[in-house]
Amino acid sequence: MKTTTFGNHLHPALEQLHRNTCLWIGHMNSGPADHLAGQTFQCPEDGSLNNIQVYTIAVSHPGKLILTLHEFDKQRKNWGQVLSSVEIEVDENDTENWVQFPLKSVQLHKDNTYGFRLKSPDTLVAIGEAAWSSTSPFAYGEEWNANNIESKDHYYRYFSLAFKVELRA
């Protein structure tokens, strides 16, 4: 995990680049569930969020990928209202690439916890993730996943999506 402070230009303020496995989101043909994923993070500085990137390992076929940004209450594990959202189109050319989600500018505050959720109604996408040691979990947030059948959220400190949070200071 890397945090960097720059001047007044867009920069990756928080990034987790390591990946040694993947998490599938979207709809698998083998069952009725839609799989969702996300990542919580503690913001390292004040700034205007303009872009989040995630690393895609595979895209099964062309479709939509939707990202929503939320405030997150880490004590109660509660997702707040949507602060910003964006829907992009992905296809096989996005395989093994950083996919950008350009967001309407949102002011984030240092040390507050936020989170983003990813879903797809019509394709299956493998998002890069890192598996950490249970004795040395990811320090800046938790990976989240769920499906539309169970109505149960799962949070993991020892997993993290591969992501970049870009801020303008």
Task: Give the location of each predicted region.
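Beta-sheet-rich sandwich/jelly-roll-like modules and their strand-loop junctions
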Residues: 1-77, 103-113, 117-169
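A short local loop/turn or secondary-structure capping micro-motif enriched for an aromatic residue
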Residues: 91-93, 124-125
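Aromatic sugar-binding surface patches on proteins
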Residues: 94-101
